[in-house]
């Protein structure tokens, strides 16, 4: 199985991006459903619970981003060694990735448990919403190791093109989460904390399944033997030169989201926060197919870069961008046309029904950026594929902080358009930055092809 996956990555780049993207897409949509499922069940707890957990969202984005980012570092490193046909280095990269996941889990758990309350207060949480946020966040952060290993180890499988088994582990996890959520929240009476506990238990199962394949069953392309492990700083650096910037991608987005929430809270208080975070759940769900395409681009570009094939690098990026635009357009149409119906998913009680019109407006305005975001996403992940994680981070900063935070402040605060201005700023900032990102990626690829001579 593993060798077939490797051959797909080394073959036709358009076919490879498409074949790899579909299972990643399913995995990511299922992973995003954690947030959706939690939101549906938590909606029954009232506006304070929705807002409180909404305040945790930026912090959750950071910890989830670290796990995905470190997984991206593993994917990039392993795929480049696979392209260069260096099996030993690919296996060493996988072993070093596991060590990095362990260290990150311990450090981040301690940091987030200490900082969660000050951060929630900074976002504007107080009273019951602050209590609900802490109640949800504490067990979530205690189980951080599960997220790190589940997402990180998936990155190892993706580095060798084994996307399907990464998807299977997620399927088990999501089904378990859907079963445990109502039990932990309502039957056991744990409320907000129950949603977090259900998510953590599900992630633990996902991590166990993937680590079993890699460490026990040993039927992967990479051959990890922890008993023979020897630390090699050059391999660790190769992983981290993509993994750290990729992790910081989500940190940057979390910082940007924190600023959006400060703007929104100053305009409309808990009502605005509840509307935004409910709509944001759907936006994050909708963007998963675009992220999946980008992740496939990382693996294929990494393999092509390792093989020094400039033509395949160019074709993989261009196809990924087109694929992303098509998916982004389809998703946008669904969100705009069915905005009202989708909004009621998170506001189905008498207490939260008044949120529906504003969630609807968010979906119909903020999500208009998705088609162009598809091209931008493929471009951001292209840089991870060639091992230039810092440039990938640079474009995330341009998109989320410079363009989008600037646009939301300009339209929402400076011009005084209120929440509609915030929603418009989200769409305009992200769309404009994505266009520039794509153009710069094409310029970079032109230089790579000239250097490689193909």
List the predicted regions and their residue ranges.
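Short alpha-helical transmembrane segments in multi-pass integral membrane proteins
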Residues: 1-21, 78-145, 187-243, 301-369, ...
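Signature of the first transmembrane helix
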Residues: 15-75, 79, 244-264
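Transmembrane helical elements of multi-pass membrane transporters/channels
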Residues: 19-35, 139, 150, 173, ...
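Helix-terminus/linker motif at the lipid-water interface of multi-pass membrane proteins
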Residues: 29, 33-51, 120-127, 183-190, ...
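Small-residue hotspots at the loop-to-helix junctions and early N-terminal turns
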Residues: 47-58, 133, 137, 196, ...
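Small-residue-rich hydrophobic transmembrane alpha-helices
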Residues: 50-110, 147-166, 261, 275-339, ...
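Hydrophobic transmembrane alpha-helices of multi-pass small-molecule transporters
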Residues: 62-65, 109, 177-182, 207-211, ...
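Short runs within selected transmembrane alpha-helices of multi-pass transporters and secretion channels
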Residues: 71, 140-158, 166-177, 195-210, ...
């Amino acid at each position: 199985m593993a060798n077939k996956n490797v051959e797909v990555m080394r073959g036709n780049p358009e076919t490879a991006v498409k074949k790899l993207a579909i299972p990643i897409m399913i995995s990511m949509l299922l992973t995003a459903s954690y947030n959706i499922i939690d939101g549906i069940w938590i909606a029954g707890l009232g506006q304070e619970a929705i807002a409180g957990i909404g305040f945790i969202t930026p912090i959750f984005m950071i910890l989830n981003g670290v796990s995905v980012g470190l997984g991206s570092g593993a994917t990039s490193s392993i795929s480049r060694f696979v392209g260069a046909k260096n099996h030993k280095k690919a296996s060493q990269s996988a072993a070093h990735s596991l060590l990095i996941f362990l260290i990150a889990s311990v450090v981040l758990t301690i940091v987030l448990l200490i900082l969660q309350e000050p951060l929630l207060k900074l976002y504007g949480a107080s009273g019951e919403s602050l209590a609900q946020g802490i109640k949800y966040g504490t067990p979530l952060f205690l189980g951080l190791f599960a997220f790190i290993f589940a997402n990180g180890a998936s990155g190892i499988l993706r580095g060798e093109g084994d996307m399907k088994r990464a998807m299977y582990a997620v399927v088990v996890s999501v089904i378990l989460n859907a079963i445990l959520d109502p039990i932990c929240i309502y039957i056991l009476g744990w409320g907000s904390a129950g949603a977090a506990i259900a998510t953590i238990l599900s992630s633990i199962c996902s991590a166990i399944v993937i680590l079993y394949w890699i460490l026990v069953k040993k039927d992967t392309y990479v051959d990890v033997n922890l008993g023979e492990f020897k630390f090699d700083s050059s391999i660790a650096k190769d992983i981290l030169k993509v993994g750290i910037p990729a992790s910081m991608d989500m940190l940057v987005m979390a910082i940007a989201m924190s600023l959006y929430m400060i703007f929104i809270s100053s305009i409309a208080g808990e009502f605005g926060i509840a509307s935004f975070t409910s709509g944001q759940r759907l936006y994050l769900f909708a963007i998963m197919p675009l992220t999946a395409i980008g992740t496939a681009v990382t693996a294929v570009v990494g393999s092509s870069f390792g093989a020094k094939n400039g033509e395949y690098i160019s074709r993989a990026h261009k196809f990924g961008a087109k694929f992303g635009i098509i998916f982004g357009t389809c998703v946008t149409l669904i969100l705009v046309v069915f905005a009202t119906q989708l909004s009621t998913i998170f506001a189905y009680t008498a207490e939260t029904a008044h949120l529906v019109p504003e969630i609807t407006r968010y979906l119909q305005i903020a999500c208009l950026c998705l088609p162009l975001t598809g091209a931008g996403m493929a471009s951001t992940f292209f840089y991870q594929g060639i091992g230039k994680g810092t440039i990938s981070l640079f474009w995330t900063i341009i998109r989320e902080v410079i363009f989008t935070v600037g646009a939301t402040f300009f339209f929402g605060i400076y011009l005084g358009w209120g929440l509609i201005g915030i929603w418009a700023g989200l769409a305009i900032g992200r769309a404009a930055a994505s266009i520039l990102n794509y153009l710069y990626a094409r310029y970079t690829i032109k230089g790579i092809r000239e250097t490689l001579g193909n």
